Amino acid sequence: AKNVFGIDAKNPFNSSMVGYAATLISFPNKISTWILPRSLRNNETEFLNLHEMLSFTFNNVEIPDSLTGATALEVFKYSNDGLMLDQIYQNNKIFSDASFVIVGWEWISISFLIGGLFLIITRVITWHSPTAMIGSICFLSLLFFDNGSSSSGGSAMLHLFGGATMLGAFFIITDPASSPETGKGKIIFGSIIGVLVYIIRVWGGYPDAIAFAIILGNFATPLINKFTFQTHES
């Protein structure tokens, strides 16, 4: 996805997303199924709040290196069996034990958001693509929220902070090699990816869809460049 096109950074597709998507399609069970060889704790595994995580980090406490489990988007997608949104949240600790959105993922997403804003402030990246992607996901989430009914696509907070939205918006779609070159083009590009992410998450077969949405968006990049450059010249 990258070396084939040389070292001049002219690869049409985001190489990281191509690698991830190829691995996911080729070995779906291997990278999505985690089998614990033994119980990590004597009691039922509990989610840690922020204070407990910081206490474990900065105190000399013996704990497992990591705990694996379903993401918030996976829990929501496969628990939405005719239940109201409030019922899904009450029945799953990943939601009910959260500080304000989703246990664990909320702080990860906020960290990516802070890092992304820093990149914009320091002008490492521009605001166009991230704002368009986040805005389109937020708009569709509000449009199809349906007051939390059993047919709801999930809240805007779930879609913004429950998956890889912030990572994708600030650190992946801003790849200069595979994204449009003009500001208007980047807005169109980010909007397309945001719409695709929401469609695949809600009606597709994958709970998160950043990689596939970005690759599909990369297909449109040459056309976006052509259209926006012609508009700029005219």
Question: Where are each of the predicted segments found?
Answer:
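C-terminal ends of transmembrane helices
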Residues: 1-9, 114-124, 170-179
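Hydrophobic alpha-helical transmembrane segments in multi-pass integral membrane proteins
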Residues: 29-36, 144-150, 154-155, 196-208
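Long hydrophobic alpha-helical segments that form multi-pass transmembrane helix bundles
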Residues: 9-113
